[in-house]
């Protein structure tokens, strides 16, 4: 159920999810972060992307199986915001958030999303490096398909 949560409460839950994360290739904490943001605010979709190579191409790090209704892009999106995830001035990815509300991204929302992006950047360059490695690794082509 969707309910508007305070910034402090939402940030505390996000930091808890990142701190309690155990490396796993079956479940990503990024899915939990996206779900917390969608359920705790008036967002219709949240995407977490990583800059993988020097060409600026990105890979989606959230893999939703099954897709949470709030994590599917909606054609009625009215507002979008991109927040850069940076560590020491180096861009490592971005947080993409969409809302079906007209005035969804006021100053408080921007501060919240910038703090979430900062927490994600710290996580992805620290304890969450396994997610970066997984996203950067090309998927192998099956031998039958290569022939």
Which role does the model predict for each range below?
Residues 1-60, 126-127, 134-147:
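Intrinsically disordered, low-complexity terminal regulatory regions
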Residues 24, 57-77:
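Allosteric regulatory "coupling" segments in signal-transduction proteins
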Residues 78-87:
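A short, aliphatic-rich beta-strand micro-motif
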Residues 80, 92-94:
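Structural motif
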Residues 86-91, 127:
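Flexible loop/coil segments at beta-strand boundaries within sensory signal-transduction domains
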Residues 95-103:
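Short beta-strand-to-loop transition segments that serve as allosteric relay/switch motifs
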Residues 105-125, 132:
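Amphipathic alpha-helical "output/dimerization" segments
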């Amino acid at each position: 159920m969707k309910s508007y949560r305070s910034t402090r409460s939402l940030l505390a839950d996000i930091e808890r999810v990142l701190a309690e994360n155990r490396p796993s290739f079956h479940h990503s904490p990024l899915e939990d972060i996206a779900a917390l943001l969608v359920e705790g605010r008036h967002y219709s979709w949240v995407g977490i992307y990583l800059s993988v190579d020097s060409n600026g191409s990105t890979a989606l790090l959230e893999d939703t199986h099954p897709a949470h209704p709030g994590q599917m892009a909606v054609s009625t999106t009215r507002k979008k915001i991109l927040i850069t995830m940076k560590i020491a001035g180096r861009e490592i990815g971005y947080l993409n958030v969409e809302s079906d509300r007209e005035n969804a991204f006021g100053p408080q929302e921007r501060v919240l999303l910038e703090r979430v992006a900062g927490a994600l950047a710290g996580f992805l360059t620290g304890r969450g490096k396994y997610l970066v490695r997984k996203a950067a690794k090309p998927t192998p082509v099956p031998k039958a398909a290569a022939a």
